[in-house]
Regions:
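Short, polar loop motifs at secondary-structure junctions
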Residues: 33-38, 167, 243-247
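A mid-sequence, solvent-exposed acidic-amphipathic segment
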Residues: 166-199
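Class I SAM-dependent methyltransferase Rossmann-like catalytic core
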Residues: 1-24
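Short loop/helix-cap segments at secondary-structure boundaries that form the rim of catalytic
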Residues: 39-44, 172, 190-193, 248-255
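Class I S-adenosyl-L-methionine-dependent methyltransferase module
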Residues: 46-176
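Long, positively charged, glycine-interspersed low-complexity recognition regions
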Residues: 205, 213, 218-285
Length: 285
């Protein structure tokens, strides 16, 4: 099953690099740093605990599980409006002979209206999950970024399509078997028992490691990485982690490192991380 969202650091394309290390049998799947949930949707576990500290992200997954008919209906209405606006924009642009004149795109206004709702500046008739999905699919480069006031401030991405077909009934059905939580990862670690399997994709040891997360504006620093490594060593279940290779992560995980592979990033936002990096596969089994 495909993941639903655009998500920086998503693992969809990397799964072939580490799938052989995932156990064939386990009782419950646990993912404390859910993000785009590529591995969760790929494995399709019947029982799961999925968690992220990003409240708006978790509200989206909760709406997919609990309010799917309304979510689908709201997104369908927005897609019709988006497509209608796009057709009008293309018509007006083709009709304008002076190519130096900027042709209005009504989807730009729609985007900023939805962004104001997302930020709580104006009242919203939509589910939080609807707002999150719309912003995720139409913001520039799928970025998540907040200003000092805690307001999402990514500009309109000017995409031709706003595709709601990615979100399916199958996603809703799979999420029925999941506990969806919004807490610190350590609380999730404490829920693990010996026949669980945990997949970990934590923030990396780099300068740009908050993943646009409002709850992590100071980043996931060295102290946090050392806390995570210690907690990893004390886990009660089998666990596999993917993390960027740096001197710090090599020090922290040492003998737990199973292999490494090269990762090419398609977007180098603000020149804050390398377009090419090495990722390591870490296991406790």
């Amino acid at each position: 099953m495909r993941p639903i969202l655009k998500y920086r650091g998503g693992k969809s394309r990397e799964i072939p690099e580490f799938i052989r290390y995932i156990p064939n049998e386990y009782n419950r799947y646990i993912e404390p740093f859910l993000g785009g949930a590529a591995v969760y949707f790929y494995l399709e576990p019947e029982q799961a605990i999925i968690n992220d500290i990003n409240t708006k992200l978790i509200e989206f997954y909760q709406d997919v599980r609990n309010n799917f008919p309304r979510l689908q209906a709201e997104l369908g209405t927005l897609q019709q409006e988006y497509e209608r606006n796009q057709r009008q924009y293309v018509f007006n642009r083709n009709a304008e002979q002076d190519q130096t004149i900027r042709v209005e795109n009504l989807n730009e206004g729609l985007y900023y209206q939805m962004r104001d709702m997302y930020n709580g500046i104006v009242a919203s008739p939509y589910l939080n999950g609807t707002l999150y999905y719309f912003i995720n699919k139409t913001a520039y480069s799928g970025m998540i970024r907040y200003n000092r006031n805690g307001e999402f401030n990514v500009p309109f991405g000017r995409y031709v399509n706003f595709n709601t077909g990615i979100l399916t009934q199958e996603h809703n059905q799979l999420l029925q078997g999941a506990q969806i939580l919004n807490t610190d990862y350590a609380n999730i670690f404490n829920m693990a028992v010996d026949d669980d399997f945990m997949f970990l994709d934590p923030p990396y040891d780099c300068a740009f490691n908050d993943y646009g997360n409002l709850n992590m504006q100071n980043g996931f620093n060295e102290d946090e990485h050392r806390r995570l490594a210690q907690d990893f060593r004390n886990l009660n279940c089998r666990a596999l982690m993917i993390i960027g290779r740096t001197p710090l992560t090599e020090e922290l995980y040492g003998d737990y490192i199973r292999c490494e592979y090269r990762k090419n990033y398609s977007v180098n936002i603000r020149n804050r991380f390398n377009a090419e990096a090495m990722h390591i596969v870490v296991t406790n089994y």
